[in-house]
């Protein structure tokens, strides 16, 4: 018994000693702000600067010497993008990065149902976590202002109140998975044409009543951990290092304590990036900052040029301490958050959520009566029609993605034609009718004229 007592005492002392040796920044039981302060005090200037810029296409550095991990980011307007190569835009061709295709955010907004937004955020958050992403580049809350904006489908409509209400539960549920929302594109990126240099000038009333409410709600109500800057200028200064938008409004008025991350290639000036509120620079062109070159991330505006300005006293040291503190806070909330769940991917629950959101978001503009049948066409009554003709290239294409940042690698997807055939069987005939892309004529003779009872045309408006 005596030996057992001493063994227990020795074990207790050992545990106490080990616990006492854990640095504050590594101790999950400590408040995040104490961990940030402790980690910052241990870092060199070079390590702080390294946090502020990309080390690959979709990651930024950690602090290996201190065991602080890097941040991994992913596009995700409506699904987690497939893995990209370290240093170019080619796909890595992994075999385990297929995901669920969720409806576009314009469909989510069309549900007018915050519960659907919560389901969306939860499901896409679980898939992001399973894929070991720390930052999901979304949701997008820019306001519709031109129908020719090819990215309107990524956003939540033209009404600032609707976008404000719908983005909050998405962000909250996403971040419960230890994955940061990166709300984009802040601000006034409402058209894609000339987006890299267009200068947006507007009244304060329009800014605060139309274009900022969704971002404000994302920060103050949703608690967003990161914000993506836009490509455009705002009143003469680029949005990614705009003093008025970032320091005055976002970090000042709204008390945002997270990170501002550039859109890829959105930084343009080292001094402005240093003092005007930018925290992490991603995707810049690195060969003289005009074209891409291999492994030259140290040439970024917030890399060696920033380090040199700090050493020369041209910008205050307080700027790097603020940036590093914000980035550390983000890392502790995500990559170093040991309480986060493991996540899951392509589950039946995720498919069910995607279907439910899609069903609620569908808007039927017109369901005209069929002259001969005397009733609305939809839903098609199989008993009334012997044959159903489906025409159009889009009936056999998987319309689950856009291009670039909204590309998806989907595990399971059903085309409209396959879906119709699953319901109506051999009654469904198909004619391509046209090829997607530029118009092609002369295909009318492909339509089987003698067997048409009902016709569904799958098309899309010309841009």
Task: Go through each PLM region and give its residues.
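Bacterial Sec-dependent N-terminal signal peptides
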Residues: 1-22
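Glycoside hydrolase catalytic-domain context in secreted enzymes
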Residues: 20-460
């Amino acid at each position: 018994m005596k030996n057992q007592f001493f063994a227990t005492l020795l074990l207790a002392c050992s545990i106490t000693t080990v616990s006492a040796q854990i640095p504050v920044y590594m101790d999950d039981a400590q408040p995040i702000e104490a961990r940030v302060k402790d980690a910052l005090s241990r870092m060199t200037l070079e390590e702080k600067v390294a946090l502020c810029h990309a080390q690959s296409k979709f990651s930024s550095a950690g602090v290996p010497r201190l065991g602080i991990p890097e941040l991994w980011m992913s596009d995700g307007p409506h699904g987690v993008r497939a893995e990209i190569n370290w240093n170019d835009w080619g796909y890595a061709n992994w075999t385990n990065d297929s995901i669920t295709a969720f409806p576009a955010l314009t469909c989510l907004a069309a549900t007018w149902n915050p519960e659907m937004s919560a389901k969306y955020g939860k499901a896409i958050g679980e898939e992001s976590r399973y894929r070991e992403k720390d930052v999901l580049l979304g949701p997008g809350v820019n306001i519709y202002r031109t129908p020719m904006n090819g990215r309107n489908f990524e956003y939540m409509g033209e009404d600032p109140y609707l976008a404000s209400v719908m983005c909050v539960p998405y962000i909250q549920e996403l971040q419960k998975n230890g994955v940061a929302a990166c709300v984009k594109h802040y601000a006034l990126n409402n058209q894609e044409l000339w987006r890299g240099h267009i200068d947006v000038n507007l009244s304060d009333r329009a800014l605060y009543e139309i274009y900022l409410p969704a971002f404000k709600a994302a920060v103050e109500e949703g608690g967003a951990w990161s914000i993506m800057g836009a490509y455009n200028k705002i009143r003469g200064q680029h949005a990614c290092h705009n003093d008025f938008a970032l320091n005055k409004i976002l970090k000042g008025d709204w008390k945002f304590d997270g990170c501002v991350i550039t859109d890829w290639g959105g930084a343009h000036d080292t001094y402005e990036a240093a003092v005007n509120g930018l925290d992490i620079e991603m995707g810049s062109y690195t060969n003289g900052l005009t074209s891409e070159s291999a492994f030259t991330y140290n040439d970024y505006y917030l890399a060696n040029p920033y380090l040199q300005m700090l050493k020369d006293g041209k910008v205050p040291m307080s700027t790097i301490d603020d940036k590093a503190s914000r980035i550390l806070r983000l890392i502790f909330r995500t990559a170093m958050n040991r309480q986060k769940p493991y996540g899951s991917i392509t589950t039946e629950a995720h498919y069910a959520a995607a279907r439910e959101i899609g069903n609620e978001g569908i808007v039927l503009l017109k369901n005209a009566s069929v002259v001969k049948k005397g009733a609305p066409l939809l839903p098609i009554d199989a008993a009334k029609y012997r044959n159903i003709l489906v025409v159009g290239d889009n009936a056999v294409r998987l319309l689950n993605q856009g291009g670039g940042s909204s590309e998806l690698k989907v595990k399971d997807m059903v085309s409209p034609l396959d879906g119709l055939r699953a319901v109506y069987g051999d009654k469904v005939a198909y004619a391509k009718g046209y090829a997607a892309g530029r118009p092609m004529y002369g295909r009318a003779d492909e339509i089987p004229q003698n067997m048409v009872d009902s016709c569904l045309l799958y098309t899309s408006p010309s841009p």
